[in-house]
Amino acid sequence: MNNDTKINTFAIHTLGCKVNLFESNSIKNDLIMNGLVEVPFDSKADVYIINTCTVTNKADAKSRLYIKRAHVQNKDAIIIVAGCMSQVNKDLMDKLKISIQIGNKYKNSVFDLINEYLKKRERIYRVENILAEKKFEQTTQDFIFLENTRAFIKIQDGCNFMCSYCIIPFSRGRQRSQKMESILEKIKTLVSKXFKEIVLTGVNTAGYLDENNNTFFDLLNNINKLDGDFRVRISSLEPFQINDEIIDLVTSNKKRFCQHWHICLQSGSDDVLKKMNRKYTTDEFYKLMQKILNKSPLTNFTTDYIVGFPTETDEDQKKSIDFLNKIKLYDMHIFPYSKRNNTRSSHYKDINDSTKKDRVKEITKLNYLNKKENLKKYIGKTCEVLFEKKKEDEKMWSGYSNEYCRVMVESGDNLENKMLKVRIKKIFFDSLVGEIID
Protein backbone atom coordinates (compact mmCIF):
# COMPACT_ATOMS: atom_id res chain seq x y z
CA MET A 1 0.00 0.00 0.00
CA ASN A 2 1.20 3.53 -0.72
CA ASN A 3 0.32 6.78 1.03
CA ASP A 4 -2.65 7.35 -1.29
CA THR A 5 -4.20 3.98 -0.52
CA LYS A 6 -7.90 4.06 0.20
CA ILE A 7 -9.59 1.32 2.13
CA ASN A 8 -13.01 0.13 1.10
CA THR A 9 -13.54 -3.31 2.60
CA PHE A 10 -13.03 -5.08 5.90
CA ALA A 11 -13.47 -8.58 7.30
CA ILE A 12 -13.80 -9.53 10.95
CA HIS A 13 -13.57 -12.82 12.82
CA THR A 14 -14.57 -13.27 16.45
CA LEU A 15 -13.40 -15.94 18.84
CA GLY A 16 -14.65 -16.65 22.34
CA CYS A 17 -17.54 -15.42 24.41
CA LYS A 18 -20.74 -13.46 23.88
CA VAL A 19 -19.02 -10.32 25.22
CA ASN A 20 -16.46 -10.54 22.43
CA LEU A 21 -19.25 -11.11 19.91
CA PHE A 22 -21.01 -8.02 21.23
CA GLU A 23 -17.87 -5.90 20.89
CA SER A 24 -17.11 -7.20 17.38
CA ASN A 25 -20.56 -6.16 16.26
CA SER A 26 -19.91 -2.71 17.66
CA ILE A 27 -16.65 -2.49 15.67
CA LYS A 28 -18.45 -3.71 12.56
CA ASN A 29 -21.23 -1.15 13.00
CA ASP A 30 -18.73 1.69 13.41
CA LEU A 31 -16.82 0.76 10.24
CA ILE A 32 -20.01 0.42 8.19
CA MET A 33 -21.23 3.80 9.48
CA ASN A 34 -17.94 5.26 8.19
CA GLY A 35 -18.47 3.89 4.69
CA LEU A 36 -16.60 0.59 4.71
CA VAL A 37 -18.15 -2.58 3.32
CA GLU A 38 -17.94 -5.89 5.16
CA VAL A 39 -16.83 -8.94 3.18
CA PRO A 40 -16.46 -12.60 4.25
CA PHE A 41 -13.27 -13.34 6.16
CA ASP A 42 -12.15 -15.91 3.58
CA SER A 43 -12.17 -13.32 0.77
CA LYS A 44 -9.81 -10.46 -0.07
CA ALA A 45 -10.23 -7.37 2.12
CA ASP A 46 -8.33 -4.15 2.76
CA VAL A 47 -8.57 -4.61 6.53
CA TYR A 48 -8.79 -7.77 8.63
CA ILE A 49 -9.81 -7.66 12.29
CA ILE A 50 -9.32 -10.66 14.55
CA ASN A 51 -11.02 -10.30 17.94
CA THR A 52 -9.15 -12.94 19.92
CA CYS A 53 -9.79 -15.21 22.89
CA THR A 54 -7.23 -16.63 25.31
CA VAL A 55 -9.28 -18.70 27.75
CA THR A 56 -7.54 -21.91 26.55
CA ASN A 57 -4.50 -22.94 24.50
CA LYS A 58 -6.93 -24.00 21.78
CA ALA A 59 -8.38 -20.47 21.68
CA ASP A 60 -4.86 -19.04 21.33
CA ALA A 61 -4.08 -21.43 18.49
CA LYS A 62 -7.30 -20.55 16.65
CA SER A 63 -6.59 -16.83 17.07
CA ARG A 64 -3.12 -17.23 15.55
CA LEU A 65 -4.55 -19.33 12.73
CA TYR A 66 -6.96 -16.57 11.70
CA ILE A 67 -4.21 -13.95 11.84
CA LYS A 68 -2.08 -16.07 9.48
CA ARG A 69 -5.10 -16.70 7.27
CA ALA A 70 -5.62 -12.95 6.89
CA HIS A 71 -2.04 -12.56 5.64
CA VAL A 72 -2.65 -15.28 3.05
CA GLN A 73 -5.85 -13.61 1.79
CA ASN A 74 -4.11 -10.28 1.23
CA LYS A 75 -0.43 -9.78 2.04
CA ASP A 76 -0.86 -5.99 1.77
CA ALA A 77 -3.86 -5.76 4.09
CA ILE A 78 -4.01 -3.90 7.39
CA ILE A 79 -4.12 -6.60 10.08
CA ILE A 80 -5.75 -5.56 13.37
CA VAL A 81 -5.63 -7.85 16.39
CA ALA A 82 -7.80 -7.11 19.42
CA GLY A 83 -9.26 -8.91 22.42
CA CYS A 84 -8.02 -11.09 25.22
CA MET A 85 -5.04 -12.87 23.60
CA SER A 86 -3.82 -9.52 22.34
CA GLN A 87 -4.27 -8.01 25.81
CA VAL A 88 -1.94 -10.47 27.57
CA ASN A 89 0.65 -11.12 24.82
CA LYS A 90 2.93 -8.18 24.08
CA ASP A 91 5.04 -10.02 21.52
CA LEU A 92 2.32 -10.67 18.93
CA MET A 93 3.08 -7.64 16.77
CA ASP A 94 6.53 -8.79 15.65
CA LYS A 95 5.83 -12.52 15.66
CA LEU A 96 2.68 -12.30 13.54
CA LYS A 97 3.38 -9.12 11.52
CA ILE A 98 0.44 -7.19 12.92
CA SER A 99 -0.33 -3.65 11.74
CA ILE A 100 -2.39 -2.57 14.77
CA GLN A 101 -2.49 -4.35 18.13
CA ILE A 102 -5.04 -3.36 20.76
CA GLY A 103 -6.38 -5.21 23.78
CA ASN A 104 -9.85 -4.86 25.25
CA LYS A 105 -9.67 -1.08 25.28
CA TYR A 106 -9.83 1.03 22.10
CA LYS A 107 -12.24 -1.34 20.35
CA ASN A 108 -14.39 1.76 19.92
CA SER A 109 -11.51 3.49 18.11
CA VAL A 110 -10.71 1.00 15.34
CA PHE A 111 -11.71 3.35 12.50
CA ASP A 112 -9.60 6.17 13.94
CA LEU A 113 -6.65 3.82 14.39
CA ILE A 114 -6.91 2.70 10.76
CA ASN A 115 -6.73 6.34 9.64
CA GLU A 116 -3.77 6.96 11.95
CA TYR A 117 -1.98 3.96 10.48
CA LEU A 118 -2.65 5.12 6.91
CA LYS A 119 -1.35 8.59 7.73
CA LYS A 120 1.84 7.62 9.60
CA ARG A 121 2.59 4.26 7.98
CA GLU A 122 3.84 3.01 11.35
CA ARG A 123 2.60 0.02 13.26
CA ILE A 124 0.41 0.90 16.23
CA TYR A 125 0.54 -0.77 19.65
CA ARG A 126 -2.23 0.34 22.05
CA VAL A 127 -2.52 -2.14 24.90
CA GLU A 128 -3.20 -0.44 28.22
CA ASN A 129 -3.05 -1.78 31.78
CA ILE A 130 -6.57 -3.20 31.85
CA LEU A 131 -6.42 -3.72 35.63
CA ALA A 132 -6.35 0.06 36.05
CA GLU A 133 -9.63 0.55 34.17
CA LYS A 134 -12.42 1.71 36.48
CA LYS A 135 -15.16 2.92 34.13
CA PHE A 136 -17.44 0.88 31.91
CA GLU A 137 -16.59 1.65 28.29
CA GLN A 138 -19.66 2.44 26.22
CA THR A 139 -19.72 1.00 22.72
CA THR A 140 -20.74 2.64 19.46
CA GLN A 141 -23.52 0.07 19.17
CA ASP A 142 -25.74 -0.46 22.19
CA PHE A 143 -26.83 -4.01 21.43
CA ILE A 144 -26.47 -6.87 18.96
CA PHE A 145 -29.12 -9.02 17.35
CA LEU A 146 -29.38 -12.74 16.68
CA GLU A 147 -31.97 -14.20 14.30
CA ASN A 148 -33.94 -10.91 14.47
CA THR A 149 -35.60 -12.17 17.64
CA ARG A 150 -32.99 -11.93 20.40
CA ALA A 151 -30.86 -8.96 21.36
CA PHE A 152 -27.81 -8.95 23.63
CA ILE A 153 -26.95 -6.11 25.99
CA LYS A 154 -23.55 -6.00 27.68
CA ILE A 155 -24.26 -4.84 31.22
CA GLN A 156 -20.79 -5.17 32.76
CA ASP A 157 -17.18 -6.12 32.10
CA GLY A 158 -14.32 -7.57 34.11
CA CYS A 159 -14.11 -9.83 37.15
CA ASN A 160 -12.75 -9.34 40.69
CA PHE A 161 -12.49 -13.04 41.53
CA MET A 162 -9.06 -14.58 41.16
CA CYS A 163 -9.84 -18.23 40.40
CA SER A 164 -6.53 -20.07 40.29
CA TYR A 165 -6.92 -21.21 36.66
CA CYS A 166 -8.43 -18.09 35.10
CA ILE A 167 -6.75 -15.46 32.93
CA ILE A 168 -9.88 -13.28 32.61
CA PRO A 169 -9.03 -10.73 35.36
CA PHE A 170 -5.75 -10.06 33.52
CA SER A 171 -7.35 -9.86 30.08
CA ARG A 172 -10.62 -8.11 31.00
CA GLY A 173 -9.66 -6.19 34.12
CA ARG A 174 -11.61 -5.39 37.26
CA GLN A 175 -15.37 -5.35 37.44
CA ARG A 176 -17.18 -2.30 36.08
CA SER A 177 -20.80 -1.84 35.07
CA GLN A 178 -23.03 0.15 32.75
CA LYS A 179 -25.48 2.57 34.37
CA MET A 180 -28.83 1.00 35.14
CA GLU A 181 -30.77 3.86 33.55
CA SER A 182 -28.84 3.37 30.31
CA ILE A 183 -29.63 -0.36 30.24
CA LEU A 184 -33.33 0.26 30.88
CA GLU A 185 -33.51 2.78 28.04
CA LYS A 186 -31.84 0.34 25.66
CA ILE A 187 -34.32 -2.38 26.58
CA LYS A 188 -37.22 0.02 25.92
CA THR A 189 -35.75 0.79 22.49
CA LEU A 190 -35.35 -2.90 21.66
CA VAL A 191 -38.89 -3.74 22.74
CA SER A 192 -40.22 -0.87 20.60
CA LYS A 193 -38.38 -2.49 17.67
CA UNK A 194 -40.29 -5.72 18.42
CA PHE A 195 -37.53 -7.81 19.93
CA LYS A 196 -39.06 -10.47 22.17
CA GLU A 197 -35.98 -11.70 24.07
CA ILE A 198 -33.28 -9.61 25.73
CA VAL A 199 -30.11 -11.40 26.85
CA LEU A 200 -28.14 -9.73 29.64
CA THR A 201 -24.49 -10.56 29.16
CA GLY A 202 -21.19 -9.76 30.84
CA VAL A 203 -18.03 -11.34 32.16
CA ASN A 204 -19.47 -11.65 35.68
CA THR A 205 -23.13 -10.80 35.17
CA ALA A 206 -24.41 -11.15 38.73
CA GLY A 207 -21.55 -8.99 39.95
CA TYR A 208 -23.31 -6.02 38.35
CA LEU A 209 -22.91 -2.86 40.46
CA ASP A 210 -23.13 0.53 38.79
CA GLU A 211 -21.68 3.83 39.99
CA ASN A 212 -24.95 4.63 41.78
CA ASN A 213 -24.69 1.36 43.74
CA ASN A 214 -27.54 -0.31 41.87
CA THR A 215 -27.09 -4.07 42.30
CA PHE A 216 -27.97 -6.93 39.97
CA PHE A 217 -31.22 -7.41 41.89
CA ASP A 218 -32.04 -3.69 41.48
CA LEU A 219 -31.47 -4.00 37.74
CA LEU A 220 -33.68 -7.09 37.40
CA ASN A 221 -36.38 -5.57 39.59
CA ASN A 222 -36.55 -2.46 37.42
CA ILE A 223 -36.55 -4.52 34.22
CA ASN A 224 -39.49 -6.45 35.63
CA LYS A 225 -41.45 -3.19 35.93
CA LEU A 226 -41.03 -2.26 32.26
CA ASP A 227 -43.99 -2.48 29.89
CA GLY A 228 -43.95 -4.69 26.82
CA ASP A 229 -44.25 -8.27 25.64
CA PHE A 230 -40.69 -9.51 26.07
CA ARG A 231 -38.65 -11.89 28.19
CA VAL A 232 -35.16 -11.66 29.68
CA ARG A 233 -32.50 -14.36 29.59
CA ILE A 234 -29.60 -14.05 31.99
CA SER A 235 -26.14 -15.27 31.01
CA SER A 236 -23.43 -16.81 33.19
CA LEU A 237 -23.80 -16.47 36.98
CA GLU A 238 -21.61 -17.37 39.94
CA PRO A 239 -23.47 -19.54 42.48
CA PHE A 240 -22.35 -17.56 45.54
CA GLN A 241 -23.81 -14.36 44.04
CA ILE A 242 -27.34 -15.71 43.65
CA ASN A 243 -29.29 -14.65 46.73
CA ASP A 244 -32.88 -15.30 47.83
CA GLU A 245 -34.02 -11.91 46.50
CA ILE A 246 -32.87 -12.78 42.98
CA ILE A 247 -34.33 -16.30 43.15
CA ASP A 248 -37.73 -15.05 44.34
CA LEU A 249 -37.87 -12.32 41.69
CA VAL A 250 -36.93 -14.59 38.77
CA THR A 251 -39.02 -17.62 39.75
CA SER A 252 -42.14 -15.60 40.57
CA ASN A 253 -42.09 -13.71 37.25
CA LYS A 254 -41.89 -16.51 34.69
CA LYS A 255 -43.35 -14.42 31.86
CA ARG A 256 -40.57 -11.85 32.20
CA PHE A 257 -37.56 -13.98 33.22
CA CYS A 258 -36.49 -17.17 31.48
CA GLN A 259 -36.43 -20.18 33.79
CA HIS A 260 -32.95 -21.07 32.65
CA TRP A 261 -29.98 -20.55 34.92
CA HIS A 262 -26.40 -20.82 33.62
CA ILE A 263 -24.52 -21.27 36.89
CA CYS A 264 -20.76 -21.93 36.78
CA LEU A 265 -19.85 -25.22 38.50
CA GLN A 266 -16.34 -25.99 37.10
CA SER A 267 -15.88 -29.22 39.10
CA GLY A 268 -17.89 -31.79 41.03
CA SER A 269 -15.11 -32.40 43.56
CA ASP A 270 -14.84 -30.21 46.66
CA ASP A 271 -11.06 -30.73 46.81
CA VAL A 272 -10.68 -29.48 43.25
CA LEU A 273 -13.06 -26.55 43.83
CA LYS A 274 -10.92 -25.47 46.79
CA LYS A 275 -7.73 -25.59 44.70
CA MET A 276 -9.52 -23.65 41.97
CA ASN A 277 -10.27 -20.94 44.58
CA ARG A 278 -13.99 -21.30 43.92
CA LYS A 279 -16.16 -19.90 46.71
CA TYR A 280 -18.67 -22.72 47.24
CA THR A 281 -18.95 -26.45 47.84
CA THR A 282 -20.85 -29.04 45.83
CA ASP A 283 -23.39 -29.25 48.65
CA GLU A 284 -24.02 -25.49 48.47
CA PHE A 285 -24.41 -25.75 44.69
CA TYR A 286 -26.92 -28.60 45.09
CA LYS A 287 -28.94 -26.71 47.71
CA LEU A 288 -29.04 -23.64 45.46
CA MET A 289 -30.46 -25.73 42.62
CA GLN A 290 -33.06 -27.29 44.89
CA LYS A 291 -34.12 -23.88 46.18
CA ILE A 292 -34.76 -22.74 42.60
CA LEU A 293 -36.46 -25.99 41.55
CA ASN A 294 -38.81 -25.87 44.54
CA LYS A 295 -40.14 -22.57 43.20
CA SER A 296 -39.90 -23.38 39.47
CA PRO A 297 -39.85 -27.16 38.79
CA LEU A 298 -39.34 -26.97 35.00
CA THR A 299 -36.20 -24.84 35.31
CA ASN A 300 -33.17 -25.88 33.26
CA PHE A 301 -29.61 -25.51 34.52
CA THR A 302 -26.54 -25.22 32.30
CA THR A 303 -22.94 -24.74 33.36
CA ASP A 304 -19.25 -24.44 32.50
CA TYR A 305 -17.06 -27.36 33.51
CA ILE A 306 -13.27 -27.88 33.54
CA VAL A 307 -11.90 -31.41 33.20
CA GLY A 308 -8.36 -32.39 34.16
CA PHE A 309 -7.45 -29.58 36.56
CA PRO A 310 -3.88 -30.08 37.90
CA THR A 311 -3.78 -32.56 40.80
CA GLU A 312 -7.26 -33.88 39.86
CA THR A 313 -7.21 -37.57 40.82
CA ASP A 314 -9.23 -40.57 39.71
CA GLU A 315 -11.12 -40.22 42.98
CA ASP A 316 -11.92 -36.57 42.15
CA GLN A 317 -13.25 -37.70 38.76
CA LYS A 318 -15.40 -40.34 40.45
CA LYS A 319 -16.79 -37.77 42.90
CA SER A 320 -17.56 -35.47 39.97
CA ILE A 321 -19.37 -38.21 38.05
CA ASP A 322 -21.43 -39.05 41.14
CA PHE A 323 -22.30 -35.39 41.71
CA LEU A 324 -23.24 -34.76 38.08
CA ASN A 325 -25.47 -37.84 38.18
CA LYS A 326 -27.10 -36.39 41.28
CA ILE A 327 -27.85 -32.91 39.92
CA LYS A 328 -28.50 -33.88 36.26
CA LEU A 329 -27.78 -30.58 34.54
CA TYR A 330 -29.49 -29.82 31.23
CA ASP A 331 -26.22 -29.05 29.44
CA MET A 332 -22.56 -28.32 30.09
CA HIS A 333 -19.84 -26.42 28.25
CA ILE A 334 -16.97 -28.85 28.83
CA PHE A 335 -13.35 -27.69 28.62
CA PRO A 336 -10.16 -29.69 29.19
CA TYR A 337 -7.93 -27.72 31.58
CA SER A 338 -5.50 -25.41 29.80
CA LYS A 339 -2.57 -23.81 31.62
CA ARG A 340 -2.60 -20.01 31.48
CA ASN A 341 0.50 -17.95 32.30
CA ASN A 342 0.38 -15.76 35.42
CA THR A 343 -2.35 -17.85 37.04
CA ARG A 344 -1.76 -19.70 40.29
CA SER A 345 -2.58 -23.10 38.82
CA SER A 346 0.10 -22.67 36.14
CA HIS A 347 2.59 -23.60 38.88
CA TYR A 348 0.76 -26.82 39.74
CA LYS A 349 1.80 -30.15 38.27
CA ASP A 350 -0.37 -30.86 35.23
CA ILE A 351 -1.91 -34.24 34.45
CA ASN A 352 -1.18 -35.98 31.15
CA ASP A 353 -3.23 -35.28 28.02
CA SER A 354 -4.44 -38.85 27.54
CA THR A 355 -5.98 -38.85 31.03
CA LYS A 356 -7.67 -35.52 30.26
CA LYS A 357 -9.08 -36.89 27.00
CA ASP A 358 -10.47 -39.99 28.72
CA ARG A 359 -12.11 -37.89 31.42
CA VAL A 360 -13.55 -35.45 28.87
CA LYS A 361 -15.11 -38.38 27.00
CA GLU A 362 -16.63 -39.70 30.21
CA ILE A 363 -18.09 -36.32 31.22
CA THR A 364 -19.32 -35.63 27.67
CA LYS A 365 -21.16 -38.96 27.51
CA LEU A 366 -22.76 -38.28 30.90
CA ASN A 367 -23.79 -34.80 29.75
CA TYR A 368 -25.56 -36.28 26.71
CA LEU A 369 -27.47 -38.78 28.87
CA ASN A 370 -28.45 -36.15 31.44
CA LYS A 371 -29.73 -33.83 28.71
CA LYS A 372 -31.93 -36.62 27.34
CA GLU A 373 -33.22 -37.29 30.85
CA ASN A 374 -34.03 -33.60 31.33
CA LEU A 375 -35.97 -33.41 28.08
CA LYS A 376 -38.35 -36.16 29.23
CA LYS A 377 -39.90 -33.91 31.88
CA TYR A 378 -41.35 -31.65 29.17
CA ILE A 379 -43.38 -34.32 27.34
CA GLY A 380 -47.06 -33.47 27.82
CA LYS A 381 -46.19 -30.05 29.24
CA THR A 382 -46.82 -26.65 27.66
CA CYS A 383 -43.86 -24.37 26.88
CA GLU A 384 -43.72 -20.81 25.62
CA VAL A 385 -41.49 -20.76 22.55
CA LEU A 386 -39.94 -17.84 20.69
CA PHE A 387 -39.67 -18.99 17.08
CA GLU A 388 -36.65 -17.95 15.04
CA LYS A 389 -36.39 -19.74 11.73
CA LYS A 390 -37.66 -22.41 9.40
CA LYS A 391 -35.55 -25.02 7.64
CA GLU A 392 -35.44 -24.46 3.89
CA ASP A 393 -37.98 -26.48 1.90
CA GLU A 394 -39.56 -27.72 5.13
CA LYS A 395 -42.50 -26.76 7.29
CA MET A 396 -40.62 -27.26 10.56
CA TRP A 397 -40.12 -24.08 12.54
CA SER A 398 -37.71 -24.00 15.47
CA GLY A 399 -37.12 -21.73 18.41
CA TYR A 400 -36.20 -21.73 22.08
CA SER A 401 -38.49 -22.26 25.01
CA ASN A 402 -38.38 -20.12 28.12
CA GLU A 403 -36.27 -22.92 29.66
CA TYR A 404 -33.77 -22.93 26.74
CA CYS A 405 -34.96 -26.10 25.03
CA ARG A 406 -34.84 -26.18 21.25
CA VAL A 407 -38.46 -26.77 20.16
CA MET A 408 -39.74 -27.62 16.66
CA VAL A 409 -43.28 -27.48 15.28
CA GLU A 410 -44.77 -28.03 11.83
CA SER A 411 -46.60 -25.03 10.41
CA GLY A 412 -47.29 -23.43 7.05
CA ASP A 413 -47.61 -20.02 8.71
CA ASN A 414 -44.83 -17.49 9.23
CA LEU A 415 -43.86 -17.93 12.89
CA GLU A 416 -40.71 -15.79 12.92
CA ASN A 417 -40.42 -13.71 16.10
CA LYS A 418 -43.71 -15.03 17.46
CA MET A 419 -43.97 -16.18 21.06
CA LEU A 420 -46.42 -19.08 21.13
CA LYS A 421 -47.55 -21.78 23.52
CA VAL A 422 -46.55 -25.27 22.41
CA ARG A 423 -47.64 -28.62 23.82
CA ILE A 424 -44.64 -30.96 23.78
CA LYS A 425 -45.28 -34.37 22.20
CA LYS A 426 -41.89 -36.05 21.80
CA ILE A 427 -38.09 -35.84 21.82
CA PHE A 428 -36.17 -35.64 18.54
CA PHE A 429 -32.41 -36.07 19.11
CA ASP A 430 -31.54 -33.14 21.44
CA SER A 431 -34.69 -31.15 20.66
CA LEU A 432 -38.39 -31.25 21.49
CA VAL A 433 -41.25 -31.54 19.00
CA GLY A 434 -44.72 -30.22 19.73
CA GLU A 435 -47.88 -28.61 18.42
CA ILE A 436 -49.04 -25.03 18.73
CA ILE A 437 -51.93 -24.46 21.11
CA ASP A 438 -54.54 -22.12 19.66
From Swiss-Prot:
Ranges for domain Radical SAM core: 145-382
Top-rank taxon, per record: Bacteria
Swiss-Prot/TrEMBL catalytic activity: N(6)-L-threonylcarbamoyladenosine(37) in tRNA + (sulfur carrier)-SH + AH2 + 2 S-adenosyl-L-methionine = 2-methylsulfanyl-N(6)-L-threonylcarbamoyladenosine(37) in tRNA + (sulfur carrier)-H + 5'-deoxyadenosine + L-methionine + A + S-adenosyl-L-homocysteine + 2 H(+)
Classification via Pfam families: Radical_SAM, UPF0004
Locations listed in the record: Cytoplasm
Family membership noted in the UniProt record: Belongs to the methylthiotransferase family. MtaB subfamily.
Sites where the protein binds [4Fe-4S] cluster 1: C17, C53, C84
Gene: mtaB
GO cellular component terms attached to this protein's record: cytoplasm
Organism: Malacoplasma iowae (Mycoplasma iowae)
Segments forming domain TRAM: 376-438
Protein keywords: 4Fe-4S, Cytoplasm, Iron, Iron-sulfur, Metal-binding, S-adenosyl-L-methionine, Transferase, tRNA processing
The MTTase N-terminal domain, residue ranges: 8-119
Function: Catalyzes the methylthiolation of N6-threonylcarbamoyladenosine (t(6)A), leading to the formation of 2-methylthio-N6-threonylcarbamoyladenosine (ms(2)t(6)A) at position 37 in tRNAs that read codons beginning with adenine.
Enzyme class: transferase
Documented EC number(s): 2.8.4.5
Known cofactor(s): [4Fe-4S] cluster
UniProt cofactor note: Binds 2 [4Fe-4S] clusters. One cluster is coordinated with 3 cysteines and an exchangeable S-adenosyl-L-methionine.
Name the record gives this protein: Threonylcarbamoyladenosine tRNA methylthiotransferase MtaB
A molecular function (GO) term: N6-threonylcarbomyladenosine methylthiotransferase activity
